[in-house]
Amino acid sequence: MKTISKLICALAVASLTASSALPAEDIHVAKVGIDHYRGKWLEIGRTPMFLTNGCVAGYSTYSRGKTPNEVAVEDGCRLGSPRGRLKTIHGTGAIADFGAAKAKMRVRYPLFIIFNYWVRYEAPDGSWFISTTPDMSNLWIYSRQVPTKARLKQMVNKASAIGYDGRKLEFPAH
């Protein structure tokens, strides 16, 4: 319970720095199918932040929500090593552009913490994607499996191509 409380506090702090309002200028988002929001995605790369200090083997698991545009979200990681203690938090996502690209999801976590995640790129085969906050201050690379070194380089290059400084990313162990 102590770890969950720390995680909730960290999310609260992080949400103050993450954009919760959508910018006036709409930056390109990918077009994804509803299956994008099903199953487990491994967090391959991310922008460092207080919330994820000490977290490795991160993941997000999506499952069907109560309505067609709702997604049940479980975010988790292991503390210190891929075999460390599991830390999780649950939220409810709403796909904001459900009738269109299905790429903008707003997730509500406990204590009124809200994050907006926009899918900026999805690989043609659907095996990995890049998600950011609307203002691109935070970026995550997710994959269905741990990538090869060549694939990881491709992922980082794509992050740079969409306007993010790939040198800012960290790549926690899996």
Q: How does the language model describe each region?
A:
Residues 1-8:
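Bacterial N-terminal signal peptides that target proteins for export
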Residues 8-17:
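Bacterial N-terminal signal peptides
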Residues 19-174:
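A beta-rich soluble binding module of mature secreted/lumenal proteins
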